[in-house]
Amino acid sequence: METVLKAIADWIKGILTAGIMSNLSGLFDDVNTQVGNIAQQVGTKPSSFEPRVFAMIEALSRNVVLPIAGVILTFIACHELIQMITEHNNLVQFEPALILKWIFKTAISVWMISNTFDIIMAVFDITQKVVSDSSGIIAGNTRVNDIGLSMLQSSLMQMDVGSLFGLFLQSFFIGITMRILSIVIFVIVYGRMIEIYCMVSLAPIPMATFGTHEQSHMGQNYLKCLFALGFQGFLILICVAIYAVLIQSVAISGDAINSIWSIVGYTVLLCFSLFKTSSVTKSVLGAH
């Protein structure tokens, strides 16, 4: 009878051990892929990230948004002219230099909305130069190795059924968590670029407000937000560099499960840090 029970216990151990190893094998592949691609993705210009999408955004901005910006600019220019005339007693005390100032401001505003995309790309050229230069300095291996898992299987068979069942539940939860974290990293990196495309599509409207002091805060805040999105890539690289240092300090050895939980914790910390990069850059640049 004891032999039968031992055989059943060994059979259950074999099933649980196989399940644990199945859950843990390739555990870090998705996260390694996403983290490894971060530097390449954040270092790509909006025009190069997805050229077809960028061409569509540019066409929409020029054909749909730009005419609206022209109407806004016309209203602002007329309002500025009327205000200038009324402030100087209906031209009785009017100085010719003021009309030249108005013409100059209006011409600059027209030039800005006509060359909106060149200005926007110049902003991202500056920020991407910072990102590309920093990527050469910030270097680190972000890949998590699971070589220690091969030593884990032999030690699992020495454990009792209850402990193995607990480890099986942990490994199942860890597997789901790591896949969710890889999706979160993907969403953060690609969501930033989609946010950039959305900001760029409406660029002519805030650019049209630079012609008046009362409304120019809209355009100024817009440029701050653009710089914040650009420099967010720099902070993302810093987060990845810190993650690379932390992750290499973890060795999957005898106590593999605890080591894996440490890696999960560092990956959660990475995701949280990536989420915070947007608010940090906006706070530093005073954008809202």
Where are the language model's segments positioned?
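Extended serine/threonine-enriched, polar tracts that run as long, contiguous segments within proteins
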Residues: 182-189, 193-196, 200-239
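Transmembrane alpha-helical segments of multi-pass small-molecule transport proteins
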Residues: 74-81, 171-173, 200-204
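Hydrophobic alpha-helical transmembrane segments
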Residues: 66-79, 196
